[in-house]
Amino acid sequence: GGSMIDSSPMYGTAEAVTGDMLAELGMRDKAFIATKVWTEGRRDGIEQMAKSARLLRTAKIDLIQIHNLVDWRTHLKTLRRMKEEGTIRYIGITHYTDWGQAELAAIIGANQFDFVQTEYAIDTRKAEERLLPLARDKGTAVIINRPFQRGSLFRAVRGQKLPPWAADFQC
């Protein structure tokens, strides 16, 4: 099963619920916790990330991602320092739509990130053009968001019979 939980201060109570759940179940060490920084300015970024750590009930966050490129230069400096200090394990950057991928690729090309998160699905494949090959070449791990287009890909095949080869995969 999956052990990565990707959250954000933007997702309402998600960080608090995640922190409470992992603490109650005693599963923090089994989870890979990712969250995001999505604010302007160094001080606000530091405060937002500290609040995320408190809500997630962890002294060390596995991955903090600069969300949607917001003030990425400022936050990258802070995240590098945090990584050196051992309060985070990995640094990432995100953009949630196709139209942000050119800028995302330029940033990844000029800077070292451990992770990049972007949109990619069978009907949204722009990442194949530049971003995915660049991430591969730089050794940057890729997190895909919206792989099923918020369920629209499932709705498109609802009621359809599976092809015979699907049985090979226990579908």
Tell where the protein language model's regions lie, with residue ranges.
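Short, acidic/polar
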Residues: 1, 41-57, 98-108
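N-terminal binding-site loop/beta-alpha segment at the start of enzyme catalytic domains
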Residues: 1-31
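Conserved, mostly hydrophobic/aromatic
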Residues: 5, 18, 33, 52, ...
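Acidic (Asp/Glu)-rich catalytic clusters
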Residues: 18-30, 50-59, 79-84, 106-111, ...
